């Protein structure tokens, strides 16, 4: 095993500027605010850390599994909504009671998150670990912005 040489001093990565330069960051916050601000909502608790989530089809509907936690969902649209916010690392989210609101907003949310991910990863093509680190920091800023929305 070769010893690691000390890295030269590098400039700080401007996470906030990366998020602000992307139109998708503001779009995610705007879509979430539009979805939860348009009617009655309920609050669901999620895992609270960024973790890969998957949707499981069961006899009674769907479940979103993130790490050890499983959340029952009545339909696929709700499951996609919960999976997206579980993967972003939210502790809790507001879910509209009206599934048509969720169905209208989820494709745009998924596309915005995908665009944001590809944009950040394109900034660091030679170092995927650094890209993943920057993406985690950008998600943390997004979580703070969404938490700051009025209830």
Regions found by a protein language model. Give the residues of each.
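Positively charged, low-complexity intrinsically disordered regions
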Residues: 5, 58, 71, 81-84, ...
């Amino acid at each position: 095993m070769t010893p690691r040489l000390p890295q030269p001093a590098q400039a700080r990565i401007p996470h906030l500027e990366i998020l602000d330069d992307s139109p998708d960051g503001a779009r995610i916050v705007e879509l979430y605010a539009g979805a939860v601000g348009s009617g009655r909502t309920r609050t669901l608790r999620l895992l609270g850390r960024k973790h890969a989530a998957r949707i499981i089809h069961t006899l009674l509907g769907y479940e979103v599994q993130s790490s050890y936690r499983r959340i029952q969902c009545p339909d696929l649209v709700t499951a996609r909504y919960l999976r997206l916010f579980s993967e972003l690392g939210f502790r809790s989210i507001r879910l509209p009671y009206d599934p048509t609101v969720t169905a209208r907003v989820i494709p745009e949310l998924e596309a915005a998150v995908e665009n944001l991910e590809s944009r950040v990863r394109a900034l660091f093509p030679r170092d995927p670990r650094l890209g993943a680190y920057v993406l985690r920091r950008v998600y943390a800023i997004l979580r703070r912005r969404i938490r700051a929305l009025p209830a």
